[in-house]
Amino acid sequence: MADSSGQQGKGRRVQPQWSPPAGTQPCRLHLYNSLTRNKEVFIPQDGKKVTWYCCGPTVYDASHMGHARSYISFDILRRVLKDYFKFDVFYCMNITDIDDKIIKRARQNHLFEQYREKRPEAAQLLEDVQAALKPFSVKLNETTDPDKKQMLERIQHAVQLATEPLEKAVQSRLTGEEVNSCVEVLLEEAKDLLSDWLDSTLGCDVTDNSIFSKLPKFWEGDFHRDMEALNVLPPDVLTRVSEYVPEIVNFVQKIVDNGYGYVSNGSVYFDTAKFASSEKHSYGKLVPEAVGDQKALQEGEGDLSISADRLSEKRSPNDFALWKASKPGEPSWPCPWGKGRPGWHIECSAMAGTLLGASMDIHGGGFDLRFPHHDNELAQSEAYFENDCWVRYFLHTGHLTIAGCKMSKSLKNFITIKDALKKHSARQLRLAFLMHSWKDTLDYSSNTMESALQYEKFLNEFFLNVKDILRAPVDITGQFEKWGEEEAELNKNFYDKKTAIHKALCDNVDTRTVMEEMRALVSQCNLYMAARKAVRKRPNQALLENIALYLTHMLKIFGAVEEDSSLGFPVGGPGTSLSLEATVMPYLQVLSEFREGVRKIAREQKVPEILQLSDALRDNILPELGVRFEDHEGLPTVVKLVDRNTLLKEREEKRRVEEEKRKKKEEAARRKQEQEAAKLAKMKIPPSEMFLSETDKYSKFDENGLPTHDMEGKELSKGQAKKLKKLFEAQEKLYKEYLQMAQNGSFQ
């Protein structure tokens, strides 16, 4: 015994050596960087903190679907980086409220309203319209862009049509309401034309700066309301150009001090040649092939800044304005070079530089801003900071087309965000965007939106079915059921799809693939639920709930499901946050069970009126309240809370289909009746008379009424005679059948 214990002491057991599993490298986020035109690994400069600047709108008109393309797409990207990849994102966006377009539009609106308030006499209005048509015609003749030319021609034609009735009224010396009505029509049709003319003649007299701030303030508010309606998160900080003029002046001064800017006639220009010749810098990082494109450069300078005298101030045509000396009729701010206003490109550089410093992680904007705007932003900022890395990742959202065409007022396909939201919900628009790559062209069309609507309906039906399954009563332990092969297989597919979705998000936030993987996962769940239903077995609640919660979580990340935005703890303590579904569903369940009991008795007692009332409750009353009852033979009624408008559309569609079926049935019955009537009419004809009326074909007949000669008097061939004989015999049979039916009284 002692020997045995001693032996055990010498051979004491120890833990075996452990080795970690080989594992796989985690997938890393890659983003398409316009600076390299490749997908690059995303590495923020400061741990998980991400600094992000997004070019905001120039606010002088209603926001349109082109704006939605950028801001919904960037909202999705921002949410994914923040809520999925857990980056600490600081998101900055600007509002451009000083710009050539704003100045011109504000001036024109002000002058036109002044003109309208003076209530010009009809003769004076006609004279002014004719005066305005002269420069307008010159502009029309000089326009080469076909879309713009078409729009101008349409304006000219509308003005000419509106002019004729007023001219006739003046010539006829009419007065009163009829003339006033013609005046109002012409004023409305000639608004653009008169505004241009008034601006060219009186624009230099507009000196009140408040006129130039009123317009952008109105349209900025309109833009924010549109973004809220689209469920686009507000920026962490919003910068307005008008609030950063001192910072812009200092920014311009330092660029001049660093040797990359020069003063000319009170304006300051960026010296592109000096910058490009520096070993530390590169000009045209984003679109080097566009450097020197004068058309693009002039568009970037603005309509009020490309006159011959302005262009002559530059050392090189490629140089661009950092600061513009204000001309009469333009807003101005004091600066070392005289009164002026900021150039377009410098505004973003100064505001972003002030808040984000010498180097930011992400800069975003629309694809059409790459050159000259973003290339000039980069040049200015790197000239200011004397570095070569002002932006680490430049992201550009793709274009938006309307049914395959460029969106344009001239093509009459200009769609504002408000117009789009009248047709589709914010969620449906976002789903359409999610089903496309954020960096590629998105075609906003009926087909695109129909796909989004079907996707929404597909997901919603799944969520409603899972909710119905989860409402089935089980005790506390019954919710944890033993898994069979079907559950194990579905769970494996679930985790496979989660992996695929993660890889897709790492691959340049590929939401298009994510949406397809989510669709495939739901399809697998639907097959599982159908299989369980077929064998009268309840699906596994916990597994389906996990999958539904995951899908809901992803949709929340994408902004397709709104988050609860309440602050702090819920009112009333834990577990008291109100939910419409949790509140009303018990009552609806009681109503459903009561209705099932009533229907059962009505069927047993054969009371069709009760069944009709029950159907009316399901089909007509409950949809108005956003409630859907789904009856299944031999199974409990499924209760679903659905958007009221969706149910009403479904009801209308059901009625339309039923009406079509009714019409088709009536049409088939009518055709059948006509065929029977035609057959009966044919049966009534004695065979001896069937050919006698065809005198255009035959000229002679035998004693039985059979044709013997054609219309030219030639005897019929044996083949023709044989064919007619067969027809005769067939009619003879029909006629006998008719006589028999008449004798039996088979028809009236």
UniProtKB/Swiss-Prot annotation:
Zn(2+) binds at residues 55, 348, 373, 377. Residues 1-25, 653-686 are annotated as: Disordered. GO terms for molecular function: ATP binding; cysteine-tRNA ligase activity; identical protein binding; metal ion binding; protein homodimerization activity; tRNA binding. This is Cysteine--tRNA ligase, cytoplasmic. Pfam families: tRNA-synt_1e. Homodimer. A motif ('KMSKS' region) lies at residues 406-410. HAMAP family: Cys_tRNA_synth. Changing residue 400 to Q: In MDBH; loss-of-function variant unable to rescue viability defects in a yeast complementation assay. The keyword Flavoprotein does not apply. Changing residue 341 to H: In MDBH; 50% reduction of cysteine-tRNA ligase activity. L-cysteine binds at residues 56, 96, 373. A motif ('KIIK' region) lies at residues 101-104. ATP binds at residue 409. It is an enzyme of class 6 (ligase). It is found in: Cytoplasm. Binds 1 zinc ion per subunit. GO terms for biological process: cysteinyl-tRNA aminoacylation. It is linked to Microcephaly, developmental delay, and brittle hair syndrome: An autosomal recessive disorder characterized by developmental delay, motor and cognitive disabilities, brittle hair and nails, failure to thrive, and short stature. A motif ('HIGH' region) lies at residues 57-67. Coiled coil: none annotated. It comes from Homo sapiens. Its cofactor is Zn(2+).
